[in-house]
């Protein structure tokens, strides 16, 4: 039988040691599970542990008498999962500790069961001391990497604390209603009939914010393309394109296809939409999203900075360029960014953005 704590530890190890995205690491594990509650628990443990990683890591360092060996990175991640349960979840302490001990066995770490038990019990006993450990470091206190804390503090000297705190808040579940299927008011009424409380977004005409998250497969009509999950800010992109019938549109850096779909929903009478992305695996996600929504576009694998690889030579009336960025603005939704992003990435990303802009201008109609 699968132990959810062990599964979550494996997911986190793939992010921390393997530098995989949390989405990809979770997909590997969740694709093999059918139980909705187990899937939800693994997601909660993985997202939560990574959200508070730099705080939990400081706590773990204080509780361990000596560092774990590199080959025991899965055990280290399991201990972080256990600490997350004790410090941030309502799981009874005895259950969190016992299940973590059992998880060590499932990770083939029978020798470490006593260590897991001792570390987690000491977390309870030494609570006041551990609060002092957290308070001694801005990285631990605000649960962000030290380099990012310094950058935010320098750039927003009056607001840096609130900016970092915002990165640790749970994000709301925001939907985009497919207006080819329902009006927003009609879908809100459908949610109301199923006792799912939600509110319309004021700044995005297709947006809905749920008062409490629910699994996407529990959303009415989700599998049939009635709605998509998309942040409210991201929904502004298609609206700002000022789309009209007969236009040729390019969505560059299009994966996973949320904005591509939004463009097609917003103006079904386009002359054509081309969606390009450099990552073959992520291009498949564009296809998957369009298939679920019953939409179609020309989807190409290619580098948007090298149009000669894929461009047909005809200019576009509108181009949406969602250029790669640091993603620091969406850390609350993607907490793995705290571990995956490095200081040197910022300069490299800025150069990439400039190259993409230079490549896109000649493709735009005068």
What would you call each of these model-derived segments?
Residues 1-366:
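S-adenosylmethionine
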């Amino acid at each position: 039988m699968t132990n959810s704590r062990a599964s979550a530890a494996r997911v986190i190890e793939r992010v921390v040691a393997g530098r995989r995205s949390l989405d990809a690491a979770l997909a590997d594990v969740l694709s093999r599970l059918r139980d909705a509650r187990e899937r939800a628990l693994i997601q909660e443990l993985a997202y939560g542990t990574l959200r508070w990683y730099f705080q939990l890591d400081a706590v773990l360092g204080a509780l361990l008498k000596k560092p774990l060996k590199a080959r025991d990175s899965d055990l280290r991640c399991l201990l972080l999962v256990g600490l997350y349960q004790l410090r941030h979840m309502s799981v009874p302490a005895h259950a969190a500790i016992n299940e973590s001990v059992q998880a060590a066995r499932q990770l083939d770490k029978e020798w470490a069961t006593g260590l897991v038990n001792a570390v987690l019990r000491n977390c309870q006993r030494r609570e006041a001391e551990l609060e002092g450990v957290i308070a001694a470091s801005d990285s631990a206190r605000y649960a962000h990497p030290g380099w990012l804390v310094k950058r935010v503090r320098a750039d927003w000297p009056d607001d840096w604390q609130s900016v970092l705190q915002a990165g640790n808040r749970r994000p709301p579940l925001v939907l985009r209603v497919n207006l080819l299927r329902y009006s927003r008011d009609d879908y809100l009424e459908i949610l109301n009939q199923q006792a799912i409380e939600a509110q319309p977004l004021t700044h995005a005409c297709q947006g809905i914010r749920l008062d409490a998250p629910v699994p996407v497969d529990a959303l009415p009509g989700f599998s049939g393309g009635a709605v998509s999950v998309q942040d409210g800010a991201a929904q502004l992109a298609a609206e700002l394109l000022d789309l009209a019938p007969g236009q040729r549109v390019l969505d560059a850096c299009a994966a996973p296809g949320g904005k591509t779909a939004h463009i097609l929903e917003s103006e079904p009478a386009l002359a054509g939409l081309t969606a390009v992305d450099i990552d073959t695996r992520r291009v498949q996600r564009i296809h998957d999203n369009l298939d679920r929504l019953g939409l179609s576009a020309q989807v190409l694998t290619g580098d948007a900075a090298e149009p000669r690889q894929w461009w047909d030579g005809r200019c576009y009336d509108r181009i949406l360029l969602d250029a790669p960025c640091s993603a620091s603005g969406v850390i609350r939704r993607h907490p793995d960014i705290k571990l995956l992003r490095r200081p040197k990435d910022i300069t490299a990303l800025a150069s990439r953005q400039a190259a993409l802009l230079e490549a896109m201008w000649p493709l735009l109609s005068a």
